[in-house]
């Protein structure tokens, strides 16, 4: 978020684009703020609390259509897409010494599903269901980020779900401190999941992404950037133009491991909510 906020910002008095200054939108100062995740971000955009935000493609589509996990809620018809950014892989992490080797092995175990307002919680719930389990079949914990990895490291939980572009810092840190494994999300369960929900795709996390962890088959969703239909057309156009500027490309290439995968060629990949 901070990387993209920097790319689209151009504060008053800053240097010219191409001469050491930002190639962002003139006089725009964008700031990245933390949130509880995809559901929180979508709600904040629709309520006008935030001008834009990142969300998982599945969560945004369900919010826009009032279907899936948002069944019974008023469709978020003002939600609009700016661009698809990168893939976020579902990491199911357990200690290497554990006997958890598949999703079905989670039955009866202490599992962090993340906070109920997050996209991770939604995905974890669907992954459990596609493998014949429900959230009531596990001892669910609502831990996020470092609280989740610390709990796994200290034996307070048996497994954690994390949805993030790899490598994600919290798991890099965890894997350097204790022997962990990524539990596969594959086979019939993954096939059922990707067949029912088109936003999921089967995609591996390569060997060596995390210390001592072999390649594992898992599933992924798209991380996309959203705004409201009420935002000014010209402003969103200029923001989009700044995002794809060649100077912004340099920032993204070095700013995050996933930065290089944010490209104009994939900007419409998996988009299920109308563009602004």
Language-model regions: role of each:
Residues 110, 116-126, 198-266:
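Ligand-binding clefts/hinges and TM-proximal coupling segments of bilobed small-molecule sensing domains
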Residues 4, 147, 154, 164-182, ...:
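An extracytoplasmic/periplasmic, membrane-proximal ligand-sensing/linker region
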Residues 3, 25-29, 37-40, 47-50, ...:
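Extracytoplasmic
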Residues 1-20, 28, 84-154, 249, ...:
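Bilobed "Venus flytrap"/periplasmic-binding protein-like clamshell domains
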Residues 3, 7, 40, 44, ...:
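Extracytoplasmic/secreted proteins, especially bacterial periplasmic and envelope-associated proteins
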Residues 57, 68, 98, 134-232:
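Pocket-lining segment of extracytoplasmic ligand-binding domains
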Residues 72-88, 208-217:
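A structural signal for short loop-to-beta-strand junctions that line the ligand-binding cleft
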Residues 18-73, 146-151, 157, 166-175, ...:
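Pocket-flanking alpha-helical
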């Amino acid at each position: 978020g901070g990387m993209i906020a920097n790319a689209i910002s151009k504060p008053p008095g800053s240097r010219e684009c191409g001469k050491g200054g930002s190639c962002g939108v003139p006089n725009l100062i964008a700031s990245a703020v933390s949130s509880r995740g995809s559901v929180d971000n979508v709600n904040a955009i629709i309520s006008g609390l935030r001008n834009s935000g990142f969300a998982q493609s599945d969560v945004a589509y369900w919010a826009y259509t009032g279907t899936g996990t948002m069944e019974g809620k008023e469709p978020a018809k003002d939600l609009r897409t700016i661009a698809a950014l990168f893939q976020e892989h579902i990491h199911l992490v357990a200690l290497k010494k554990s006997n958890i080797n598949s999703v079905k092995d989670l039955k009866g175990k202490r599992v962090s599903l993340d906070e109920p307002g997050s996209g991770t919680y939604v995905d974890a719930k669907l992954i459990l269901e596609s493998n014949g389990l429900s959230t009531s079949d596990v001892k669910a914990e609502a831990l996020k980020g470092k609280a989740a990895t610390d709990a796994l490291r200290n034996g307070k939980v048996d497994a954690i779900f994390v949805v993030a572009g790899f490598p994600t810092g919290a798991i890099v840190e965890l894997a350097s401190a204790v022997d962990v494994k990524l539990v596969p999300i594959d086979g019939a369960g993954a096939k059922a999941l990707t067949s029912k929900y088109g936003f999921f795709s089967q995609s591996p996390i390569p060997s060596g992404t995390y210390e001592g962890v072999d390649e594992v088959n898992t599933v992924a969703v798209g991380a996309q950037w959203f705004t409201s239909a009420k935002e000014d057309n010209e402003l969103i156009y200029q923001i989009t133009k700044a995002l794809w500027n060649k100077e912004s490309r340099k920032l993204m290439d070095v700013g995050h491991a996933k930065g290089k995968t944010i490209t104009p060629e994939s900007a419409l990949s998996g988009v299920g909510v109308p563009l602004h």
